[in-house]
Amino acid sequence: IPIVLLSGYCWLDPNLRSILGLAWDCGAVTTGPVTVPLVLSLGIGIANAAGKGDSSLSGFGVVTVASLFPILAVLCLAIFVSYTVSPEQIIAAASAGKALIASQATVETSVWDKTPLIEIVLGVRAILPLVLFLMFVLFIVLRSTLPNKMVTTYGLTLSILGMCIFNVGLTYGLGAIGAQTGSALPAAFMELPISQFSPIYPEAVGVVLVIGFAWLLGFGATLAEPALNALGLTVQSLTNGAFKKSMLMYSVAGGVSVGIALGVAKLVFTLDLMTMLLPLYLIGIAMTVVSTEEFVNVAWDSAGVTTGPVTVPLVLAMGLGLGNAASAVEGFGILALASICPIVAVLSMGLAIQLRQKM
C-alpha cells in the first residue's frame, strides 16, 4: 500500500512521473540467480524450523518482500531529490555527464574496456562476499559446522567460475544483441536512419510483428531463467509432485510474455505506465484475497524470479533501444509489467484448479 500511494504521488507530479518506470523496474532486477535460491532456502528453512504455517509452501513470500523495498527506496529517493534539487540543476548535471562521456570516448581505453576483466570481477563480487558472510554466521554466530566440506567447496568454486563466464557472455552476447535488436525493431513500422529499407512493413503489420516478437522473447527467455527452474523444483519437491514444475514454469512464462508485450505496446503507443500497472495490481490483490495460501505464496514469489540474468539484459536493452528509436519519453516499465503479469497468471491457474476440485 505505501508503494502504491507513493507511486500515485509521483504520477501526479510531472517532474516525478518519468521515474515510475525506473523505480518499478528496480524491483524486478534485484532478485537474480544468486539471491533467489538463497532467499528461498532461508525462507523455507526458517518456516520449517519455527513450525509456522499449515502449508509446506508457507516459507515462500520472502522474494516478494525483497522485490518491493527497492521500489520504495527509489521512490523515496526521487521525492527527496525533487525537494532538495531543482530540475534545472538535474538537467545541468546530466548535460555535464554527457559531455564528460563524449570527451572520454576519444581517450584511449583502459584495460577494463579492452578485456572482460570487469565482468570477472563482478562475478566474483556477486558470490564471494555473500559466502564469507554466510560462513561467519554459520561458524561464529551459530557455532555450527559445515557438513560435506569438500562437496560444498567444489560447488562454490563452480558457482564463482560459472558466474564469471555468465557475466562475460551477457555483456558480449545477450546484452549486445538485445540492444541492437531493440534499436532496429521500430524499422518494422516506422522510418529509421539506420535502416534504408524502413519502414519494412505497413504500420499495422509492423506493430503486430514487434509486439509478437516481444511475446516470444518473453516466453523463451523466462523458460531459460535459472531462478524459475529453482523455484519450480522447490515447489514440486515441497508438494510431493502435486504442483508440477512444468505447470508453474509455463504459466509464469505465459504471464511474463504478456507483460513484455504490454510493455512494448506502452512504448510504441506512448501509453502511461500507471494506467496499465495499477489495474493489474488491483486484479492481483483481488485474486490474492480469494486464493489459497499455497498459490498466493508461489504466485507473488514468481514475480521476483522471472526477471533474472537472461531476461533482464534482453528486455532492458530492447526497451531502451526501442524507446530511443521510437522517441518514447522513457524506455523503462517493461520489467514492471513483466513482474505483475505472472502473478495474475499463477493466481488464475490456482483459482482454476480450485474450481475444478470443487466440481
Which sequence ranges carry the predicted segments?
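Transmembrane helix-loop boundary segments of multi-pass membrane transporters
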Residues: 1-3, 18-31, 118-122, 150, ...
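Helix-loop-helix junctions within the multi-pass membrane cores of secondary transporters/permeases
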Residues: 1-5, 204-288
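Small-residue-rich segments of transmembrane alpha-helices in multi-pass membrane proteins
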Residues: 2-8, 31-37, 65-74, 156-167, ...
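Transmembrane helix-loop junctions in multi-pass membrane proteins
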Residues: 7-21, 46-53, 76-88, 112-113, ...
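Membrane-interfacial loop-to-helix junctions in multi-pass transporters
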Residues: 12-13, 33, 185-211, 241-248, ...
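C-terminal membrane-solvent junction of multi-pass transporters and transport-like membrane proteins
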Residues: 22-34, 55-64, 288-317
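Structural signature of hydrophobic alpha-helical transmembrane segments
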Residues: 26-39, 119-131, 205-224, 272-282, ...
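Signature of multi-pass transmembrane helix bundles
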Residues: 50-177, 182-188, 200, 332-341, ...
